[in-house]
A protein has these predicted regions:
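N-terminal, active-site-proximal structural segment of metallo-dependent hydrolase catalytic domains
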Residues: 1-160, 166-168, 234, 238, ...
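Beta-strand-turn-beta hairpins that frame and shape the catalytic cleft
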Residues: 79-89, 166-168, 176-180, 199-215
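Internal catalytic domains of large membrane-associated glycosyltransferases
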Residues: 104, 138, 142-143, 147, ...
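Catalytic lobes of large eukaryotic enzymes
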Residues: 148-153, 216-221, 225-475
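Active-site beta-strand termini and strand-to-loop segments that position acidic
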Residues: 173-174, 204-208, 344-345, 400-402
Length: 475
C-alpha cells in the first residue's frame, strides 16, 4: 500500500528497588490514588452483593442488576492486557573504524529473553568524501554488518538515517513489523553554525502498537569547556526537528523519547589521579557530583524531564585502541561518561510540583495526556552498562536494555494480504487482501511484490510486479 514501511537530580535516575532496574510510566494517577480507587470499587461490590442477597427472583431490580454486571464483565473483557516488549539500545562512537568481526556480545544475541527491537546509534562513522559517496551508492559497512548478523534471526531493518558520521539504525522482529507505522526520519546539523553535519542529531520516529516513540541520536560539541553549548545544541535539535503528523509535530510531542549518543559531557574539576583512583576502585559515585550532564540536569528544566540509569560502569572515553587502558598519548584526555542513554515520558501539561531528594531518586512517575492514559506505557530499564571487550575505537560502546510495558492500541494489521493456493512461476497466482474498516483508501494505493533480501534483513530492492488496488481480489 502507499503507506508502507518504505515511506520511509537531582534526578540522575529512578530505581524501583530491585537491583538497578529503573522505571518510569505514563499512568494517569499515582500509585496511592490507584489503591484508593480499587478500595472504593471493592466496597461498592461488597454493597452490591448485599443487595443481591435481598432481591427476589421476580424483582425488576434483579434483572437490572444482572444486566449491569454483564456490561461490567464485558467491559473488563474488552480491556487488552499489558504486554512487554524488549528494547536493546546501543550507542557507540566508532572513531571511523570498521566494524569488529563479531557483535554477538554487543547485541546480547546469546541471552534470554530475546530482543524485540534494536536501536543502534553510531557516531563518527567514516565519512571521508570517497567513502561517504560509496556508502550512498551501496550500504555502509556498519549497516551491512548489523543486517548480516540480525537477518538470520528474523530481524528486519525498519528504518535508518545518516548524516555524515551520524548513523541511526532500527531493527525489529518480523512479527512486530505490521504494527510499526508512521515512520519518519530527520536530522539537524549543529557543526560549523549548522552548516556542517559532523555534529548534530539524527532521529527516527514511529508508532509502535499505537504508541508514538522517537529516538534521537546525537553527537554534540566536544571538550571540557563547552557544556553550555552542548545543552544549547540539544535544545536546538529538539526545537528544529519536526514531523508531518498533526498529533506529534515535534520530538517532545511523542509519548516516549530516547536521547542517546556521544553527548560529550565531561567530569569537571577532578584531577587525573583522583579520577583514575576512583575508577580503579569502582567508586564511581565520587564522580557523579562533577559529571557535567548531571549538573546541567539540575539547572535546565527541559533536561529534568529526562531520566537516566545510574552510572555504575567505567567512563567510556578515552581509551588507547585495542586496550582497556585510558589515554596514554601526549594529550592524556581525562576519562568521562561521554556516551549516554536517557529517556523521557511525555509529561502532563501541568506537572505536579514535587520535592525531590538529592542523589538517585527512588521513585518517578511521569504522566501522559495521550488518550487520558487508556493505553499507558511504562519504561523499565533492565541494564545500563558498557562493553569493554571492543577496542576498535577510543570509546567503549554503551548498552541500554529496556522493557516497554504497554497496552496495545492497535493489534490488527492495516492490510492483510493472503496468497491463495500454491504459487509457482508457470501458473496464475491469486492473492486476496482485506483492510480495516476505517482504513483511508486512495485511488493511488497499490500492492507491490518485492524480492525479500533476507541476507540483508530488509524487504525492498527491485519491485517485481505492481498492481493497482481496485477490488478485494487480485489475479
Amino acid at each position: 500500500m502507499s503507506e508502507s514501511l518504505k515511506t520511509g537530580m537531582d534526578l540522575p535516575c529512578v530505581s524501583d528497588g530491585v537491583g538497578d532496574r529503573v522505571r518510569s510510566d505514563s499512568t494517569s494517577s499515582t500509585a496511592s490514588q490507584g489503591s484508593k480507587g480499587r478500595l472504593l470499587l471493592r466496597q461498592r461490590l461488597s454493597q452490591l452483593l448485599t443487595c443481591v442477597e435481598d432481591l427476589s427472583s421476580d424483582d425488576e431490580a434483579n434483572e437490572e442488576v444482572s444486566r449491569t454486571l454483564a456490561e461490567a464483565f464485558q467491559l473488563c473483557g474488552n480491556i487488552s492486557p499489558r504486554e512487554t516488549l524488549r528494547l536493546h539500545m546501543v550507542t557507540w562512537n566508532v572513531a571511523t573504524a570498521e566494524p569488529p568481526d563479531d557483535v554477538t556480545s554487543l547485541l546480547y544475541l546469546d541471552t534470554q529473553p530475546t530482543t524485540d527491537l534494536y536501536v543502534i546509534g553510531l557516531q563518527e562513522v567514516n565519512a571521508a568524501p570517497l567513502k561517504f559517496l560509496s556508502d550512498l551508492l551501496l550500504e555502509d559497512s556498519w549497516s551491512h554488518h548489523f543486517m548480516n548478523t540480525l537477518a538470520p534471526r528474523e530481524y528486519i531493518k525498519v528504518s535508518s538515517v545518516r548524516m555524515q558520521g551520524l548513523l541511526l539504525l532500527v531493527f525489529s522482529k518480523k512479527i512486530h513489523v505490521p504494527f510499526i507505522r508512521d515512520i519518519q526520519t530527520t536530522y539537524t546539523r549543529t557543526g560549523l553554525f549548522g552548516y556542517w553535519g559532523n555534529k548534530g542529531g539524527v532521529s527516527v520516529r514511529f508508532s509502535l502498537y499505537g504508541h508514538m516513540m522517537c529516538f534521537v541520536n546525537c553527537h554534540l560539541a566536544a571538550h571540557m569547556d563547552y557544556a553550555l553549548q552542548r545543552v544549547d545544541e540539544f535544545e536546538y535539535i529538539l526545537e528544529t526537528q519536526d514531523f508531518d503528523l498533526v498529533n506529534t509535530p515535534s520530538v517532545r510531542d511523542h509519548k516516549v523519547v530516547f536521547w542517546f549518543g556521544d553527548l560529550n559531557f565531561r567530569i569537571a574539576d577532578h584531577g587525573m589521579h583522583f579520577l583514575r583512583s576512583s575508577i580503579n576502585s569502582g567508586r564511581f559515585n565520587l564522580l557523579w557530583e562533577r559529571d557535567q550532564l548531571l549538573t546541567m540536569r539540575k539547572k535546565e528544566p527541559f533536561l529534568q524531564e529526562f531520566e537516566e540509569g545510574p552510572l555504575k560502569f567505567k567512563p567510556t572515553y578515552k581509551f588507547d585502541l585495542n586496550s582497556d587502558t585510558y589515554d596514554t598519548s601526549g594529550k592524556k584526555r581525562k576519562p568521562a561518561w561521554t556516551d549516554r542513554i536517557l529517556w523521557r515520558i511525555k509529561p502532563k501539561n501541568t506537572p505536579a510540583a514535587e520535592d525531590k531528594e538529592e542523589g538517585w531518586a527512588s521513585t518517578s512517575t511521569h504522566h501522559s495526556d495521550d488518550g487520558q492514559d487508556e493505553y499507558p506505557i511504562k519504561v523499565l530499564q533492565d541494564t545500563y552498562t558498557c562493553d569493554p571487550s571492543y577496542g576498535v575505537s577510543d570509546h567503549k560502546p554503551v548498552i541500554g536494555i529496556f522493557d516497554l510495558e504497554m497496552r496495545k492500541q492497535s493489534d490488527c494489521p492495516l492490510v492483510c494480504v493472503c496468497p491463495e493456493g500454491h504459487w509457482s512461476a508457470d501458473q496464475e497466482a491469486v492473492v486476496s487482501y482485506t483492510v480495516l474498516e476505517d482504513f483511508l483508501s486512495s485511488t493511488w494505493d497499490w500492492i507491490g511484490l518485492y524480492k525479500v533480501r533476507l541476507e540483508e534483513g530488509v524487504v525492498g530492492g527491485e519491485v517485481v510486479f505492481v498492481l493497482p488496488v481496485s477490488t478485494n481480489l487480485l489475479e
